[in-house]
């Protein structure tokens, strides 16, 4: 339907002004037009002496609070898309990152939507830990006046699939809130499920919340300060790998690479604490092995996202081959009627255990079958990029980005296996070769705004990466705050990552203290948490001086051990019981003085 413009003599604009306005707004979305309407109304009201009649008070429009709890950016993208959908439907919405949400106001929420991922062993994403703890504490209020919906993102290769979403959904209902929609648990291929859920949420909320006037939309705090980049996960930058240097010794059990990527004149920006997303290709030899095991040729046509590709090309570029899941094992067993795998079907624990220990290609080798190409594609998950903590600051390296990559290598019955992305960077991209990358911003792992604030950095293994970026930034800023690094690895002589750089920072006085834990250099294993305990009194003094604490690395063991040790130190030197120590650390987290980048 076309709306006819009124006669020009009835308009308050002359033809030239009208033409300029139409040209300026020709490509605006309905949401942007609504915002502009409210913006001009605000400008008019601010003009001194403007003789404008005050509009009649509008009926109060309830705000939909949309909480984004993201670990790798996917939950944030779903939440942003839902925000745009709600604004397009003229609903009043406020999007807030879980780390910024004042959770004690939750009792006042009328309409609440949570989009959350899960990390580690079923834990909430880092930015949602404080909210999660609050809801599960004795302080959580009754939520009888709240209606809610939850969308969970997860990965079926992990045992506690979408556990954070399940936790929020169950706890909100337990506290008396009304469930608007059944929770959705989405796997790594979440886009279709998210689009369907968003449409249902919009319809459910339209029935609950009246449409807001444009000015009300514009003043509702609807748009959060979310980063935008010229390149994204969906449209990555094709950059150049300029340096691939092994930084562990020849006798090390680990293969760790320092990777430098030239961003050219792309204008791609990042901050210390951000992650680099890397799109990789599977090893052609792995593709060939899998195809041959299934008695296929590799040139069979298959359909991927509406395009027809040869099977081998589809497997190399579009499907996950290095991570098996319980679902894949179960579906393969059912499809092939495998005598060795069928007994696992229905036993979640056994399926999970088998998938964790057996790559897809070895599952096919141990339980051979013949599948057609489309059946194989139907079993597999789409390839997803890997995220690496950035190990550089643009204040020092300008148009480069550095990452520290632990290359995954192991054997299955004498056959060499490797991680998909790590071996791609280490083995298959030549220097000056192309690699597709994007920045995943992480505002939950940031240096203190005040350069005089002390910083405590705890990062064993490749967890050292963001702290290299931190120190480059502190050096460039001339920051006067003290810096203390805890680092650990198996052997001093083989595994001291960036040793010369850390020694230089110590010599210059920028790195105030460094404590090193070498787990295999003596009979008794020593880890970073042991060094924390050993330095407990001094650690407590730094905390009392306002230090910010950062932890980076393994989520499943190290991060938990470090947190337990921090609680012990707080309890002992702060003269607190366990409950008070936990409350103290939670408060540090809320104040952004305890931040973690764990994976």
Curated annotation (Swiss-Prot):
Component of the sulfite reductase complex that catalyzes the 6-electron reduction of sulfite to sulfide. This is one of several activities required for the biosynthesis of L-cysteine from sulfate. The flavoprotein component catalyzes the electron flow from NADPH -> FAD -> FMN to the hemoprotein component. HAMAP family: CysJ (MF_01541). It comes from Klebsiella pneumoniae subsp. pneumoniae (strain ATCC 700721 / MGH 78578). It catalyses: hydrogen sulfide + 3 NADP(+) + 3 H2O = sulfite + 3 NADPH + 4 H(+). GO terms for biological process: cysteine biosynthetic process; hydrogen sulfide biosynthetic process; sulfate assimilation. Its EC number is 1.8.1.2. Residues 64-202 form the Flavodoxin-like domain. This is Sulfite reductase [NADPH] flavoprotein alpha-component. InterPro entries: CysJ, CysJ-like_FAD-binding, CysJ_Proteobact, FAD-bd_FR_type, Flavdoxin-like, Flavodoxin/NO_synth, Flavoprot_Pyr_Nucl_cyt_Rdtase, Flavoprotein-like_sf. Binds 1 FAD per subunit. Binds 1 FMN per subunit. Coiled coil: none annotated. The lineage of its organism: Bacteria, Pseudomonadati, Pseudomonadota, Gammaproteobacteria, Enterobacterales. Its cofactor is FAD; FMN.
């Amino acid at each position: 339907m076309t709306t006819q413009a009124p006669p020009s003599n009835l308009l308050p604009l002359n033809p030239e002004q009208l033409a300029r306005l139409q040209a300026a707004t020709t490509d605006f979305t309905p949401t942007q037009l609504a915002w502009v309407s409210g913006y001009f109304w605000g400008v008019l009201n601010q003009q001194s002496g403007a003789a404008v009649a005050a509009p009649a008070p509008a009926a109060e429009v309830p705000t939909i609070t949309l909480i984004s709890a993201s670990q790798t950016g996917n939950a944030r993208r779903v939440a942003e898309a839902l925000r745009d959908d709600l604004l397009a439907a003229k609903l009043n919405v406020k999007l807030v990152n879980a780390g910024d949400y004042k959770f004690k106001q939750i009792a006042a929420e009328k309409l609440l939507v949570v989009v959350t991922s899960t990390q580690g062993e079923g834990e909430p994403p880092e930015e949602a830990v404080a909210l999660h703890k609050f809801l599960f504490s004795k302080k959580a209020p009754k939520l009888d006046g709240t209606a809610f919906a939850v969308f969970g993102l997860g990965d079926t290769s992990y045992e506690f699939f979408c556990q954070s979403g399940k936790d929020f959904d169950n706890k909100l209902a337990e506290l008396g809130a009304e469930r608007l929609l059944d929770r959705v648990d989405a796997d790594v291929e979440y886009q279709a499920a998210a689009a369907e859920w968003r449409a249902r949420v919009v319809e459910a909320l339209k029935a609950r919340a009246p449409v807001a006037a444009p000015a009300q939309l514009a003043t509702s705090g609807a748009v959060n300060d979310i980063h935008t980049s010229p390149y994204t996960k969906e449209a990555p930058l094709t950059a150049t790998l300029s340096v691939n240097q092994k930084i562990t010794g020849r006798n090390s059990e680990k293969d760790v690479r320092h990777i430098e990527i030239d961003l050219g004149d792309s204008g791609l920006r990042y901050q210390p604490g951000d992650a680099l997303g890397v799109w990789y290709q599977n090893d052609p030899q792995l593709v060939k092995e899998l195809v041959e095991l299934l008695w296929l040729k590799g040139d069979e046509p298959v359909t991927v996202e509406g395009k027809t590709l040869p099977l081998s090309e589809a497997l190399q570029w579009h499907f996950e081959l290095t991570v098996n899941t319980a679902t894949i094992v179960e579906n393969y067993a059912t499809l092939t009627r495998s005598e060795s795998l069928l007994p696992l079907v229905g036993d979640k624990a056994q399926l999970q255990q088998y998938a964790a220990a057996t790559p897809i290609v070895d599952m096919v080798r141990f339980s051979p079958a013949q599948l057609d190409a489309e059946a194989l594609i139907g079993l597999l998950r789409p390839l997803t990029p890997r995220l690496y903590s950035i190990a550089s600051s643009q204040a020092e390296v300008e148009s480069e980005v550095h990452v520290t990559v632990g290359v995954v290598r192991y054997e299955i019955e004498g056959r060499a296996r490797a991680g998909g992305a790590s071996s791609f960077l280490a083995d298959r991209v030549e220097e000056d070769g192309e690699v597709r990358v994007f920045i995943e911003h992480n505002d939950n792992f940031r240096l203190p705004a005040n350069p005089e604030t002390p910083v405590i950095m705890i990062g064993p293994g490749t967890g050292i990466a963001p702290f290299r970026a931190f120190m480059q930034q502190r050096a460039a800023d001339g920051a006067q705050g003290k810096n203390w690094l805890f680092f650990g690895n198996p052997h001093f002589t083989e595994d001291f990552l960036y040793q010369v750089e850390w020694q230089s920072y110590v010599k210059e006085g920028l790195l105030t203290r460094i404590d090193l834990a070498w787990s295999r250099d003596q009979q008794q294993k020593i880890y970073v948490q042991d060094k924390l305990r050993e330095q407990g009194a001094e650690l407590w003094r730094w905390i009392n001086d306002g230090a910010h604490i950062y932890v980076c690395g393994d989520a499943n063991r190290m991060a938990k051990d470090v947190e337990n040790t921090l609680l012990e130190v707080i309890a002992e030197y702060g003269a607190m019981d366990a409950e008070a120590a936990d409350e103290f650390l939670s408060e540090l987290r809320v104040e952004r003085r305890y931040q973690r980048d764990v994976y």
